[in-house]
Amino acid sequence: MASLKCSTVVCVICLEKPKYRCPACRVPYCSVVCFRKHKEQCNPETRPVEKKIRSALPTKTVKPVENKDDDDSIADFLNSDEEEDRVSLQNLKNLGESATLRSLLLNPHLRQLMVNLDQGEDKAKLMRAYMQEPLFVEFADCCLGIVEPSQNEES
């Protein structure tokens, strides 16, 4: 499953374009005000693997190494011939402009679920678990309603 960190990264508090990342958990935020709000609920333990890696790195400046497997699998997915699995640019814009979707994303619990899903190692397992949560199902249904409106109306 592709990472959610593509070109649509938004501030975890106000959903605006972020300028910074939390030093503890690496979630994006756009201002001091948003950082202060985030800091109240920040859980630095959401990134324990990164902490271990950083503590094992030498103290001199080293360019971070990208996860080659993730890059390859994303590239394979993007280059696949399965056009029906791709979301058009127009539908991506529609997702970004949806007031309903934006209001759902204001929920801190849903946002934490999304961060956990994005950062989790077993995304398929997390997705199965999250699809048991009514809030996440509402979010998924909203996204599908925007991306595939005709299929949603038939069911």
UniProtKB/Swiss-Prot annotation:
PTM annotation (Phosphoserine): residues: 80
A UniProt-annotated Pfam family: zf-HIT
Gene3D superfamilies assigned: 3.30.60.190
Residues passing through the membrane, by range: none
Effect on the protein of changing residue 31 to L: In PEHO; increased protein degradation; decreased protein abundance; does not affect localization to cytoplasm and nucleus
PROSITE patterns for this protein: ZF_HIT
InterPro entries recorded: BCD1, Znf_HIT, ZNHIT3_C
Domain of life where this protein originates: Eukaryota
Residues binding Zn(2+) 2, per UniProt: 22, 25, 38, 42
Keyword Repeat assigned: no
Binding site for Zn(2+) 1: 11, 14, 30, 34
Annotated localization: Cytoplasm; Nucleus
GO MF term set: nuclear thyroid hormone receptor binding; zinc ion binding
Mapped zinc finger ranges (HIT-type): 11-42
UniProt subunit comment: Thyroid receptor interacting proteins (TRIPs) specifically interact with the ligand binding domain of the thyroid receptor (TR). Requires the presence of thyroid hormone for its interaction. Interacts with NUFIP1. Interacts (via HIT-type zinc finger) with the RUVBL1/RUVBL2 complex in the presence of ADP.
Disease tied to this protein: PEHO syndrome: An autosomal recessive syndrome characterized by progressive encephalopathy, lack of psychomotor development, severe intellectual disability, early onset epileptic seizures, optic nerve/cerebellar atrophy, pedal edema, and early death.
This protein's name: Zinc finger HIT domain-containing protein 3
Native source organism of the sequence: Homo sapiens (Human)
